[in-house]
């Protein structure tokens, strides 16, 4: 700061001290708000909130959740203790909570259910002496509190608010995020924290997929070692409801249920006897299984209105031998699936649930008229939209913050680049999600704006998915969850950069270049994924089929590997090829990405001390950076191995002793790589297990049946424990290669009367 600026700032501070303690806000209050409010007007003047403030209520009961949340969150986030005054207008500085039906008018909305939207509307008025939150109903009051909390900012040890006014309401009623616990399970206290975080972003629905992580009374054999009991599930349901979040049960059918059909007790319900992917849609016993499981979930989810009856990717409905006759009678595979949806959907409706389904292939547009209008279309299809609306069905907009990306969502895409000439092409369904050119946030916003802009459907909300297929930690999904749901609150006039930049201060508080952290994590994870090539593999059972058809003969799955290191000659340690030359582009990229990883680790460490909130989230982000770093170091260590072996070959004739010593150094690197890999994996596991129950074969008197999905090759399914994170390294035959090099080394040493060496590389072990 130059001298003139310092004098000017000093004068301003003195002037502020003489004029009622107002000062320019240390940062824009409006730019910390997510979702983006409908109407905002801030003055720019900021004042301190501290323990001298109180809270007063008007027509708000003592146990109202908005009041409780205000008091608890101010204390937890900012260390402010508000005195709770009696009802009525306060004296002195006070936060005033008011419920007054009809007090807040709402503007135009996409959702036609304006009654529901009015209940969520609020007005937040901030003045020097009072902050007043007025709402038509308790839900709106709660949302006004969340906005007020987001608007506060810590600066030099004090908490500031900015004067002004916000009038706000949602564009659509339901803002659902999908939490996928198919391959892991959060501890109960962690799940409550997650739900509380969702409520902070005005997320109103939490679709929770548990698969075997729920204690199904009707299907006890599928229950995994760690699972929520009915009591715990109801506890989560009630907790979510208190925060105006509906916990929505999620169950797949007829497809995506290997977690059920892999068990011997249910093999007779399969559509195909040699596939655990989907069940028969013409078997009454299969209907009973799904409905009984639904009943188990509903009994522990009292008060719920919705259920996700996920008909996702039911590719083979009508193609199984037992299905064909009924499909022909109805006039097609889509009509058979529509009949199944109708049959199950009607039963769910009788149980008081509105079912969301995937309106997609093999169903066709005409099949929509065969589905009951109480069914909710969970996937927007522009071509079918008018038919669905005319039929009386309501519509959700499906979008996703994560598909099959490794380690971290593609918030910022990495430009495509071919690193291997002989890598298997990406032809399978999950590898065709594209490059996500706009990044996850941009793609979500574009999808939502496109759908609502077409005005073809009776929209009721957005559904933001975060898939567990690739085994990511869902802590990495929050940027997408918060911004995707925010676009369901307001998308008109909102930009990708605006949503993203609002997320960081609202989620973390004070940060250091957090956007750079997310950019680097995105590109680091993308390089982690493409730095290994894809090859057919026999590490698991073959794949039964894909979206278009069942394979005549199941095809091998694919795994990632690296080009094999060359084996030295016994005679003179010469190498048949130079591994470094053949992989020059890969290794150059690895060196560059390691430099960027250094920047990433520095920023993460700085933010661990800088942020006000979400320290655990940063710990998880750091584990992602560590996994990327370990991969980069492995690649560069392989470069060093090749360099040492090349040097050994060049000195083998003139100085055998030096050549053997160089070979030993190369083998020592392999041992070090293994140890560093295991150390990183153990650190990652320990961090993730702070929130997760351990992934184990046995616990609580239950055993996990480890059998992979016959169609979907989800990496977390490859192993029982957390070693799926390093699975490709465990299967890369570097240990076998090192053993072969050791044999060559000892034979060469013997020829030159040099000592032998014994070693157990134990490459595939994750233990020290």
Where are these predicted regions, by residue range?
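Structural motif
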Residues: 56-64, 98-103, 136, 181, ...
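Bacterial Sec-dependent N-terminal signal peptides
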Residues: 1-29
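Contiguous, structured surface segment used for ligand recognition
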Residues: 23-172
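Short, Φ-rich (hydrophobic/aromatic) sequence segments
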Residues: 37, 64-77, 145-155, 190-193, ...
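Feature activates predominantly on carbohydrate-active enzymes
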Residues: 110-349, 356, 463-467
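Substrate-binding groove of N-acetylhexosamine-processing glycoside hydrolases
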Residues: 33-36, 41-43, 51, 90, ...
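Flexible loop/turn segments at secondary-structure boundaries
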Residues: 63-64, 185-187, 213-217, 254-258, ...
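Residues at alpha-helix termini
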Residues: 73-77, 200, 242, 350, ...
């Amino acid at each position: 700061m130059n001298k003139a600026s310092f004098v000017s700032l000093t004068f301003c501070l003195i002037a502020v001290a003489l004029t009622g303690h107002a000062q320019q806000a240390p940062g824009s209050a409006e730019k910390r708000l997510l979702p983006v409010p409908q109407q905002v007007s801030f003055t720019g003047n900021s004042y301190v909130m501290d323990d001298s403030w109180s809270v007063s209520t008007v027509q708000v009961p003592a146990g109202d959740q908005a009041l409780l949340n205000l008091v608890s969150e101010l204390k937890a986030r900012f260390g402010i203790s508000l005195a709770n005054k009696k009802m009525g207008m306060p004296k002195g500085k006070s936060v005033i909570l008011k419920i007054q039906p009809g007090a807040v008018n709402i503007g135009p909305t996409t959702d036609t259910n304006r009654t529901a939207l009015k209940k969520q509307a609020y007005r937040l008025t901030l003045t020097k002496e009072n902050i007043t939150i007025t709402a038509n109903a308790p839900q709106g009051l709660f949302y006004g509190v969340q906005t007020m909390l987001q608007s506060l900012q810590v600066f030099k040890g004090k908490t500031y608010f900015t004067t002004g006014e916000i009038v706000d309401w949602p564009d659509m009623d339901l803002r659902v995020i999908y939490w996928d616990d198919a391959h892991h399970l959060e501890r109960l206290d962690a799940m409550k924290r997650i739900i509380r975080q969702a409520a902070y972003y005005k997320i109103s629905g939490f679709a929770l997929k548990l698969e075997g992580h729920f204690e199904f009374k009707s299907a006890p054999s599928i229950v995994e070692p760690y699972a929520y009991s009915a009591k715990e599930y109801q506890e989560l349901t009630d907790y979510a409801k208190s925060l105006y979040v509906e916990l929505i049960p999620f169950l797949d059918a007829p497809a995506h249920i290997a977690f059920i059909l892999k068990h011997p007790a249910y093999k007779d319900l399969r559509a195909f006897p040699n596939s655990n992917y989907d069940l028969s849609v013409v078997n009454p016993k299969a209907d009973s299984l799904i409905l009984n499981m639904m009943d188990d979930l509903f009994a522990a989810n009292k008060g719920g209105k919705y259920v996700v009856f996920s008909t996702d990717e039911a590719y083979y409905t009508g193609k199984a031998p037992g299905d064909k006759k009924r499909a022909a009678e109805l006039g097609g595979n889509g009509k058979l699936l529509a009949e199944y949806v109708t049959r199950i959907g009607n039963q769910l409706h009788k149980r008081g649930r509105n079912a969301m389904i995937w309106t997609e292939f093999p169903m066709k547009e005409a099949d929509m008229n065969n589905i009951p209008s109480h069914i909710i279309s969970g996937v927007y299809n522009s071509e079918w939209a008018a038919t669905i609306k005319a039929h009386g069905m309501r519509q959700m907009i499906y979008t996703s913050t994560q598909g099959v990306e490794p380690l971290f969502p593609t918030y910022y895409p990495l430009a495509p680049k071919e690193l291997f000439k002989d890598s298997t092409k990406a032809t399978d369904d999950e590898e065709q999600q594209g490059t996500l050119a706009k990044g996850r946030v941009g793609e979500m916003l574009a999808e939502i704006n496109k759908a609502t802009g077409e005005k073809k459907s009776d929209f009721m909300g957005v559904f933001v998915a975060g898939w567990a297929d690739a085994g990511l930690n869902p802590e990495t999904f929050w940027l997408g969850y918060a911004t995707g749901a925010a676009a369901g609150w307001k998308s008109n006039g909102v930009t990708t950069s605006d949503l993203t930049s609002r997320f960081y201060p609202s989620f973390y508080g004070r940060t250091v270049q957090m956007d750079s952290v997310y950019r680097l994590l995105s590109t680091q994870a993308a390089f982690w994924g493409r730095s290994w090539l894809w090859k057919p593999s026999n590490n698991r059972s073959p794949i039964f089929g894909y979206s278009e058809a069942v394979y005549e003969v199941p095809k091998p799955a694919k795994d990632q590997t690296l080009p094999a290191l060359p084996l030295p000659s016994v005679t003179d340690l010469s190498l048949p090829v130079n591994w470094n030359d053949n992989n020059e582009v890969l290794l150059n990229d690895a060196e560059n990405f390691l430099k960027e990883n250094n920047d990433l680790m520095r920023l993460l460490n700085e933010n661990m001390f800088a942020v006000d909130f979400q320290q655990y989230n940063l710990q998880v982000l750091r584990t992602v950076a560590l996994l990327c770093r370990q991969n980069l170091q492995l690649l560069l260590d392989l470069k060093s191995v090749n360099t040492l072996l090349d040097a050994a070959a060049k000195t083998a004739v003139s100085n055998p002793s030096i050549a053997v010593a160089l070979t030993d150094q190369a083998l020592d690197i392999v041992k070090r790589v293994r140890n560093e890999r295991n150390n990183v994996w153990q650190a990652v596991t320990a961090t993730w297990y702070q929130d997760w129950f351990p992934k184990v074969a046995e616990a609580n008197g239950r055993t996990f049946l480890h059998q992979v999905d016959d169609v979907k090759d989800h990496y977390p399914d490859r192993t029982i424990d957390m070693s799926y994170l390093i699975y490709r390294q465990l299967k890369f035959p570097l240990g076998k290669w090192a053993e072969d090099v050791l044999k060559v080394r000892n034979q060469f040493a013997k020829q030159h009367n040099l000592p032998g060496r014994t070693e157990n590389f134990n490459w595939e072990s994750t233990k020290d």
